[in-house]
Amino acid sequence: MLMPKRVKYRKQHRGRMKGNAKGGALVNFGEYGLKAMESHWITAQQIEACRIAITRTLKKTGKLWIRVFPDKSYTKHPAESKLGKGKGNVEGWVAVVKPGKILFEIGGVDEKLAREALEYAATKLPIRTKIVKRHEIGGEAV
């Protein structure tokens, strides 16, 4: 699973997810991308499930770029524990995703196969997504 090697503070505040993505909203590496349309936490397990789904669809052709990383820990108390007694133990790692963020990119394959792979990966995520294509105007990527 994806997780940071080390962090300064293990336990974080939950935070708020308001507004759109600040960066990472353009397809920079591949030709096709999967763009988030809603705010949500994406877990390391969901990212891994998408990675497996895409690589199985692409087989040995093309290249995959994962543009999100789970760098935020979330905590949970054990079942049937009483309230209080401090913050729970770290349960897992999530990536905070806002609308407009590119989650995955694919390059080196035709459009039909790229769409098939990204549509299959989108079923593994808890958010609405959209498949976007790299925009090129006058030979330059925008």
From Swiss-Prot:
Disulfide bonds: none annotated. One of its GO terms (biological process) is translation. GO terms for cellular component: cytosolic large ribosomal subunit. Keywords: Ribonucleoprotein, Ribosomal protein, RNA-binding, rRNA-binding, tRNA-binding. InterPro entries: Ribosomal_uL16 (IPR047873), Ribosomal_uL16_bact-type (IPR000114), Ribosomal_uL16_CS (IPR020798), Ribosomal_uL16_dom (IPR016180), Ribosomal_uL16_sf (IPR036920). Pfam families: Ribosomal_L16. GO terms for molecular function: rRNA binding; structural constituent of ribosome; tRNA binding. It comes from the Bacteria. HAMAP family: Ribosomal_uL16. Part of the 50S ribosomal subunit. Binds 23S rRNA and is also seen to make contacts with the A and possibly P site tRNAs. Belongs to the universal ribosomal protein uL16 family. This is Large ribosomal subunit protein uL16. It comes from Thermosipho africanus (strain TCF52B). The lineage of its organism: Bacteria, Thermotogati, Thermotogota, Thermotogae, Thermotogales.
